[in-house]
Amino acid sequence: MNKPVAPNSYKTGPDEEGMFGIFGGRFVAETLMPLILELQQAYETAKNDPEFKAELNALSTFYAGRPSKLYYAEGLSKHLGGAKIYFKREDLNHTGSHKINNCLGQILLAKRMGKTRIIAETGAGQHGVASATVAARFGLPCIVYVGASDVERQKPNVFRMKLLGAEVKPVSAGNGTLKDAMNEALRDWVTNVEDTYYLIGTAAGPHPYPELVRDFQSVIGTEARQQILEQEGRLPDVIVAAVGGGSNAIGLFHPFLDDASVKIVGVEAGGRGLEGEEHCASMSAGRPGVLHGNRTYLLQNADGQILEGHSVSAGLDYPGVGPEHSWLKDSGRVDYVPILDNEALDAFQLCTRTEGIIPALESAHAIAQAVKMAPTMGKDKVMIVNLSGRGDKDVHTVGKLLGMDI
C-alpha cells in the first residue's frame, strides 16, 4: 500500500496537497477542512500500521472472498478471433462488485476515528449495498443517498440496502443521479461533522479520498498482475476497464502504470453519442473544472455549469472523473475512449451468450472495447478486462430496452 517508487514513476502522486499535476486538491467548505485533515492523518497512520493491514487482509479474504479469479474468457476470445481475453472477476466478490474492497478499508478507518454514523452516495446501487453491508457487519447506522432516477433503475439494490438496515434517501434535485446524490451526502457531512464518516464510493472527491480509494482498490491490479504472470508467464499487452468516477479502473491500472509494455485503456460512457449532451465522457468531451472538492475533467457548458449527462449504466452517469485519471490522460499514459449505449448493450448480450456470465452494464462498456480491439490483435496477444460487477441489478433495465416484459 505504501511501497517506495522511482522519481520518474507514474505512481508518485498525489503530492502533499493532494494534487496529481494540476488535478485533485481539496476544494471544500471551511467547516469540512479540519475533518479532511483528520481523515488524512488517520489514513497515513493506518496504512503504515501492520495491525490495520492484517485486519483488512483478513476481511478481504474471509468476508469478501479475495483473491478474485483471473478467468480466460475462451468462448468470447474464440468468437472474436483475436487476442486472448482474460476477465478479472470482481463480480464474484461478496456483494457482487469491486465496491466491497474500498468499503472494508474505509469502515476500518471510520472505526479508528471513532465515528458512529456512516453516510454514502450511490449510483448503480453497488456502492450503497457494499456500504450498507460493512455498516451492518460492524453494527453502525448507515444512510445512503441515491438519485431518484437511479432508485427507479436499481430497485433490487435499493431493497438490498434496506434489508441490510440502511436508510435510503432518494434525491430528486437536478436529474436525480449520482452527482446529485453526492451533493446531498456532502451537505449531510457538513452538518454532522462530529460523529459522521462519509464513505465515498469512487476515486474522486477532496484529498485524501482519491488516494485512499485507489489504494484500497489496487488489490485488483496487484492480484491480476501476479495471476497473469502465473497463467501466461508474462504481462498482458492491454488492460481495459470502465471509467465512471474511476475506482475499479484505477484499481486495475495503478499496479501496471510503470510497465511500459502494457497499453492501458479506460472506457467512458459515450451514451447516445458525443455530439450532444447525452453522454458522460468527461475526458473525451469535457474540460477541467472543480466539482465535489477536486479539480478534474468535467462535463460543463460555456458558463462552467455542470451538465447532467446520460448513460444506460447508472454507475457511469457521473459528469466528472477521479483526478488521477485526468492526470493520466494528460500525461499520455492511459487512453480514454467512449463506448455508446448500444455498443455496451450488444457486449452485455454477447458476453452472456459466449461465457455464461451476465456482466454489469458498467463492465459491459469495457467488454465492448475488448470486442473492438481483440480482433485487430494477434492470437498470441493477451488482454485483461476488469469485470467490475455482476449484472443481476441491470436485468430489468436491459429487458426494458430490448422490449422484454420482466
UniProtKB/Swiss-Prot annotation:
The keyword Lyase applies. Its EC number is 4.2.1.20. Keywords: Amino-acid biosynthesis, Aromatic amino acid biosynthesis, Lyase, Pyridoxal phosphate, Tryptophan biosynthesis. The gene is trpB. Belongs to the TrpB family. Its cofactor is pyridoxal 5'-phosphate. GO terms for cellular component: cytoplasm. CDD domains: Trp-synth_B. The lineage of its organism: Bacteria, Pseudomonadati, Pseudomonadota, Alphaproteobacteria, Hyphomicrobiales. It comes from the Bacteria. GO terms for molecular function: tryptophan synthase activity. The keyword Amino-acid biosynthesis applies. Gene3D superfamilies: 3.40.50.1100. This is Tryptophan synthase beta chain. The beta subunit is responsible for the synthesis of L-tryptophan from indole and L-serine.
